[in-house]
């Protein structure tokens, strides 16, 4: 069971989490025009668009044929999270009258692709944006929702305005204690060990592993940090860093049986110290606080990982918290 926010959904009316019963009020398709294609995923094609009524830029996510229930889930989750810190805003839901293909209309974020952007970051930028991402994660977890697909591709950053948005809630799900969830979620490089060993009773802490994998790639300048060629190889790549003895301790604790395919590929590995990943190119991002923070995220045992709220209180973010306090103080000065 999750260490935090375990009973959020059971304390809410059924209509909050029972997405099957959601009623979609469709907007007017003709209010939107496609400008250009900006991306595609497994479940959708994404376009920059324009609202022809008010000439506001927007993002149009055209959903590929998928179960109605999945579409309802994404919409319900976005509605429940509306107005939360750094959560992408769902503006409208429309559908084509002929094909019945639904599209989700979102706020536009002037994103720079992470492979271009992250190398430009300084140490403070990394701290700042990870802190902004933690705000979104703590908020969604506090609302009883796991994102289940945290990765750089789903974190939009408008660097000029220092604005971050967590996007793509298509795999997100409501957390109910004791429920067994599908382990075929998240993207390979960001899958937590629980998914790779087929442990289905996972919780919000899955998102904290994904955040840790993302953070490791940012501070060590190694993208992705765990570079598996398949799901089984992904666990091997993790074990080469965190150690096999530690993996078996985790499996024993939760009485998890490892799939027989691992017999041939796992081997035995000593835990690698985090400092061994430091080199001339990445040392400016790495501090004792950064390593301590990373170490408290990338744990096999999901119950040992920091929660999003605990993470925000970590000393690594002291400069970010100080800056925010200073900004509030200065804003107060200008008002008075």
Swiss-Prot record:
Family under the similarity heading: Belongs to the protein kinase superfamily. Ser/Thr protein kinase family. CK2 subfamily.
Pfam families recorded: Pkinase (PF00069)
Originating species: Neurospora crassa (strain ATCC 24698 / 74-OR23-1A / CBS 708.71 / DSM 1257 / FGSC 987)
Subunit-structure text: Tetramer composed of two alpha chains, one beta chain and one beta' chain.
InterPro entries associated with the record: CK2_alpha, Kinase-like_dom_sf, Prot_kinase_dom, Protein_kinase_ATP_BS, Ser/Thr_kinase_AS
Function: Catalytic subunit of a constitutively active serine/threonine-protein kinase complex that phosphorylates a large number of substrates containing acidic residues C-terminal to the phosphorylated serine or threonine. Phosphorylates the frq clock protein thus regulating the circadian clock.
Organism taxonomic ancestry: Eukaryota, Fungi, Dikarya, Ascomycota, Pezizomycotina
Active site per the UniProt annotation: 149
Catalyzed reactions: L-seryl-[protein] + ATP = O-phospho-L-seryl-[protein] + ADP + H(+); L-threonyl-[protein] + ATP = O-phospho-L-threonyl-[protein] + ADP + H(+)
Top EC class, one word: transferase
Name of the featured protein: Casein kinase II subunit alpha
GO CC terms in record: cytosol; nucleus; protein kinase CK2 complex
Key words of the record: ATP-binding, Kinase, Nucleotide-binding, Serine/threonine-protein kinase, Transferase
Molecular function per GO: ATP binding; protein serine kinase activity; protein serine/threonine kinase activity
This enzyme's EC code(s): 2.7.11.1
Annotated ATP binding sites: 38-46, 61
GO biological-process terms attached to the record: DNA damage response; regulation of cell cycle
Highest taxon of source: Eukaryota
Domain Protein kinase: residue ranges: 32-317
